[in-house]
Each structure stands twice: as structure tokens, then as C-alpha cells.
């Protein structure tokens, strides 16, 4: 009597002889931290397969007082998904509720959470990148230049971030409450106050230098990729070449991608000659994190 091939396959699968097929996973509204009883949530995507996958933690912008995990950073979702990366898009406390360094601590909490749940979500803990844009870029720049064993990442991708906060403030010396972006002035505790600075005087300038990632670069930090439009009207393009040069001078790795004619925000990069950041970013991440 000849065996039925289909029956044989089904029996083998039932007996665990064939590995189960692990499907892609998309989950929303996952709590990753609760500072002062305030739940912080993330959305995630995990690709098809057993993994372990490289992953990215995504940090949105919005002038430190606006934005969510579902805004501004969204163009990276499809890019990373199509490249076989898992990703985790996070919220963090916004001014005036969450000033510096509370927002930094929230990003660090997200790193610890992803590392702690790496097995559950099929993540390679040694291949986690931080990706941030605008205000979120400042946060990933800061975390990347101040990493600890618990918050260590393999790479940082920073889109048009203000790495030199004093230079950013000097742009608006006559209106220091607007030193980052116009949005933050909506709150009485926003602007310079959100960073522990009362006035743009000598003490204030010293404080801004102290919290600027450009002044914290060191040889042991993770590799950085900076992506910036050279027509940015909110965070000057000059911020990124200066930051990248400082990183390289410190003995660490940095690469810069310039978006010709690009204004502030990846969502504004709609021209065909501005789309290369997608393939360039993926290629850089794979090379830097040794992803096959």
C-alpha cells in the first residue's frame, strides 16, 4: 500500500518535524513604559520568518511638544518593512509635561524594552538601530552619544536634527522662545525653558553647549548616518556637516546624505531626485550592522 504524500506531510508537521511558519506581526498600542503613571505606547512590525531580525526604534519629531508615533516618521515604515527590518515606532513625553531629559529617558526606556522583548519579537539584540527625525533626531543623537550598556545600539540614523542647540538658539536670539521650531512656543514651559534655560545669556549658552550632542561625540559611540535637505528652513543644513565632521574627528564613524533642494521633513521630499534616501539608508544600515 502506497502512502499518501499529503497525509505524510501533515503528519510530519503535526509531530513537529517541520518548523512552524512564523508570519509577519503588526501590533499597535503596546505599553513600553509608565513614567509617573503615564503610559507610553509603541506600534510595531515584525517580518515573516523565524528571524532574528535587525530592528529599528523610530522616534518622531514635532518640536518637542507635538507629534505622535503615527506622524512625521511614517515614511520610514514601508521602507524598513520592505527591507526585512522589524521596527518599533514610539511615543515620548512632550513639553510641557515631558521636558529634557525626560524625553531622553523615554527613548532609553524604549531601547531597554525592545532588548528585553527581543526573543518574543524575533529581534537580534546586537542589530538594533535608532532612527529619529527633527526633534526625534535630537533625542537619538543625544542617546547615541551618551549610551550605556543597557541602551547601547548598533547604529543611529538622524534626519535633520539640531545637534548643536546653541547654534539653533542663536538663530533666534531676538526670540529665544522659538529656538527650536515655532511649535514649541505654544507652551509657557516650552522653548528654552524645556531645556532648563531661562535666558540666552552666558549661563544659558553654557547649558545649551552642555546638552548639545555635537559636544559629546567620542570614539566609542555607534556609527551615525545623517540625512538632511540642503534647503531646510527650520534646522539649517549646516548642522549636519558640522556634526558629522565632529564625529569623525573624534574617531567614530559618520556618513552624510544630502537631499538636494530638500526642505524640512521627509514627507516634503517628493521629487524623484530626493527619493534616494530610502535605498541609501537601507544600504547603510545593512552594511553597518552586517545584515545579509
Where are these predicted regions, by residue range?
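Positively charged n-region of N-terminal signal peptides that target proteins for export
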Residues: 1-6
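Bacterial N-terminal signal peptides
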Residues: 8-19
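Alpha/beta-hydrolase superfamily serine-hydrolase fold, recognizing
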Residues: 22-292
Amino acid at each position: 500500500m502506497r502512502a499518501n504524500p499529503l497525509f505524510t506531510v501533515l503528519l510530519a508537521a503535526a509531530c513537529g518535524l517541520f518548523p512552524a511558519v512564523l508570519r509577519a506581526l503588526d501590533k499597535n498600542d503596546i505599553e513600553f513604559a509608565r513614567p509617573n503613571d503615564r503610559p507610553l505606547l509603541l506600534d510595531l512590525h515584525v517580518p515573516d520568518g523565524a528571524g532574528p531580525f535587525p530592528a529599528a526604534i523610530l522616534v518622531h519629531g514635532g518640536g518637542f511638544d507635538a507629534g505622535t508615533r503615527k506622524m512625521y516618521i511614517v515614511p520610514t515604515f514601508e521602507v524598513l518593512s520592505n527591507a526585512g527590518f522589524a521596527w518599533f515606532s514610539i511615543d515620548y513625553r512632550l513639553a510641557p509635561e515631558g521636558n529634557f531629559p525626560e524625553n531622553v529617558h523615554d527613548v532609553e526606556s524604549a531601547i531597554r524594552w525592545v532588548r528585553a522583548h527581543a526573543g518574543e519579537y524575533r529581534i537580534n539584540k546586537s542589530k538594533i538601530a535608532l532612527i529619529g527625525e527633527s526633534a526625534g533626531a535630537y533625542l537619538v543623537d543625544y542617546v547615541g552619544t551618551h549610551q550605556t550598556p543597557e541602551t547601547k545600539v548598533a547604529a543611529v540614523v538622524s534626519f535633520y536634527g539640531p545637534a548643536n542647540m546653541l547654534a539653533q538658539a542663536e538663530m533666534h536670539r531676538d526670540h529665544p522662545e522659538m529656538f527650536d521650531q515655532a511649535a514649541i512656543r505654544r507652551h509657557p514651559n516650552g522653548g528654552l525653558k524645556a531645556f532648563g534655560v531661562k535666558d540666552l545669556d552666558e549661563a544659558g549658552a553654557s547649558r545649551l553647549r552642555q546638552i548639545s550632542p555635537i559636544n559629546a561625540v567620542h570614539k566609542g559611540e555607534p556609527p551615525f548616518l545623517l540625512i538632511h535637505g540642503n534647503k531646510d528652513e527650520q534646522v539649517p543644513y549646516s548642522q549636519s556637516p558640522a556634526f558629522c565632521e565632529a564625529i569623525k574627528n573624534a574617531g567614530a564613524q559618520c556618513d552624510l546624505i544630502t537631499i538636494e533642494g530638500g526642505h524640512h521633513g521627509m514627507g516634503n521630499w517628493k521629487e524623484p531626485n530626493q527619493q534616494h534616501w530610502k535605498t541609501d539608508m537601507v544600504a547603510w544600515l545593512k552594511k553597518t550592522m552586517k545584515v545579509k
